[in-house]
Amino acid sequence: MSDLTPMIKQYLKIKEEYKDSILLFRLGDFYETFFEDAKKVSEILQIVLTKRNGNPMAGIPYHALNNYLKRLLDAGYKVAICEQMEDPQSSKGIVDRKVTRILTPGTIIDEGMLEESNRFAALITKNGNLYKIAIFDFSTGDFYLDSFDFKEDELLDFISSFGLVQILLSKELEQLSKKIKNLTNEIYVEILDEWYFSNNFKDHLKETYEVLSLDHLDYDDDELKVADAVLKYLEVTQFSKIKHMRLPKRFKTKNYMFLDSNTIENLGILPTNSNKGKTLYDILKLTKTSMGNRKLREFILTPLTDKENIEERLNKVEHLVEDPLLLEELKEYLASVKDLERISSRISLMKATPKDLIALKDSLEVVPYIIESLTSNPGLSDFFDGVDVLKEAKEFIENTIIEEPAIAPGNGKVIKEGVSGELDEYRNLFNNLDGVLKDIEKREKEKTKISSLKVGRNKIYGFYIEVSKAQSSKVPDNYVRKQTLVNTERYTIKELEEVEQRLALSEEKIKVIEKDIYDKVLTHLSQYVDKIEKLSNKIAELDVFRSFAEVSRVYNYKRPTFVQNSKEIKIINSRHPVVERFVDEFTPNDLFLSEDKFYIILTGPNMSGKSTFIRQIGLISVMAQIGCFVPAEKAEIPIYDGIFTRIGARDDIVSGKSTFLVEMLEVSTILNKATDNSLVLLDEVGRGTSTLDGISVAWAISEYLFQVKRCNTIFATHYTELTYMSHIYEEVAAKRIKVLETMDGVIFLHKIEDGTSDNSYGIEIARLAGFPIEIIERSKEILSQLSNRVDLESRLKRIKNINKKKYESQENQLKMF
């Protein structure tokens, strides 16, 4: 260590405290990294790796910090920001430096690093058989907390459905870290020390939320410890008290339709890397605000199960559908509203920029116009009742911050004139500089008789008097040479040095005073944070309702109606909301189910539209229960407590699970979790094994679903043998996709009708795919032989109805999967 410079010794001492982080060490205009950190940073950011005294070193310009930070965080690293705590020019010895912030993927707050969508993180602990899970978005203040009796695979499914960017685990769950990383490499995982869960949690929670008691919170002590651990972690990373996080709420799963990650993926509800632009979220996203985009995602992931709440949303959408002029007005106004939710979070953390405040002011100026436009519609005139429009906050910003402020106080003008007499005085001194310099220049020209003499300023050398070398012999004795150039000499005089000192003092004073005033501005505005959040939430909801209404008008969606405690479905001329956007002509279809006939076996060849149909029924149910009109001429449907799907074939190479095993595990989840109020959508279950095994399993699954679970189900299959169930069981209906056979081949009409598909048309699909004619003809020969030799029909007709009690007694055996 003796051969290390004082600065490197300082770096190593600070790095020792933050071993798990990349340390960005402020040196002048750069954030430098050293040793192993420098190698990582150089590789990730593709910047030059240099050396300082033989040690690896890589630097980031301070003005481009956010761009580089985002890339480091996206690469899965934790980053500690070490700032200079004093001016290097006035420092005697080594500059004082301290870490002022720690960033992780789940603790980003800076506008330049945030996407519009939520950045959810989670903290997970386990107590007995219960997982205690907190989900939070630091950038918005959203905070959820609940206990779950999950199996490990259910926990992983829950995690994947949220699109988390970071997971915090208690030490006893450390083994989960690897499994989570197998799930996705995009999640940053951190193990928390035990002190985060210390016994002072109640006092700390009461202090944070400024309450005298926690009795009004519906949480046990173990859950409150998790909530407190979240807040402590945020305080540690931000080096400040956390005031903007809302009180945690339970997930209240009974109030929302259950959608697991399989269903979200299978129905194309949210965008993934492979289906961007072609999901339910994408086609409903005509929102105009960032808050509205996040609220739309929240609505889609949590369809309501309470009829009154659904109808309340639908009423608002209907009022907007019937008022196209209001729709257009709101569209224009909402487009001017900035991300108030995140601005309020930054205000609370004292990290809002001057441009944030102007964005807040400009947005608050629009709110009265939004409210005024709603008064023209009796059904919406009370939408903002009880919400503060924050006139005082708007006027305060208006009177304090200039219209086009610098990026931060100290980087240019931020505070308006008239706010501080002292600040105005120093600014006047600074602003009069040109006049002072011109007076000095004029006087020195007259005094020296050097007409070409000029007074100027240089960032390095400061103020100077410039004289050509030809005239330099005329300068008086009081001129002190400062710099020699090729054709000129530069000098200084005592008066110029005094001006420079006064200017430097003025500049420093302006920075200090502006920073002090700005901090007071943020402190004053922090009293409005709760009101800003409430206003933001109402604007977000209005934005979503307006989006639903516009989509409904443009694409001729109709208001759904609901039948409670019934299996009856009457959907006329339904369409797939996404597919219809990408085809020239979409064939609509009907669906009728009743209390007596609620299980459909749907047969038809590949490419005929089976999968599209079952997906559109699922999406229509989701749309209805989020409060949106639906793509159908008429829709009378139940309110489902969950939608369960098994669609598509895939294996799990990492876990060593075959396609069939994955399929059976997913079906097992459905059989365990579905209720008589659920919707089950199955596509080609059983095809991952032999034909006879597949038919047998599919048949048994079907019997269990309609005899024991008694839930609305559509089972799309190639196994035409399954349709014989419609002859044996009154609950089952056989439907098929209509196909027209012509001399030139097969035409898929995509229309559903009663009956059984007699042909899978696999050979015809192969022909359409461009198979050689020799293979097509040979396939026909083989099919003819197999059709003559295999007669499953006679066997299936002999299957007897299995006693329902037998299923009920064996129901627990499903837990083996």
Curated annotation (Swiss-Prot):
Under PROSITE patterns, the record lists:
DNA_MISMATCH_REPAIR_2
Query: Is DNA repair one of the keywords UniProt gives this record?
Result: yes
Q: Which GO terms describe its biological process?
A: mismatch repair
Q: Name one GO cellular component term.
A: cytosol
Binding residue positions for ATP: 604-611
Q: Which family does it belong to?
A: Belongs to the DNA mismatch repair MutS family.
Quote the protein name from its UniProt record: DNA mismatch repair protein MutS
Q: Which organism is this protein's natural source?
A: Petrotoga mobilis (strain DSM 10674 / SJ95)
Q: What is the lineage of its organism?
A: Bacteria, Thermotogati, Thermotogota, Thermotogae, Petrotogales
Q: Which gene encodes it?
A: mutS
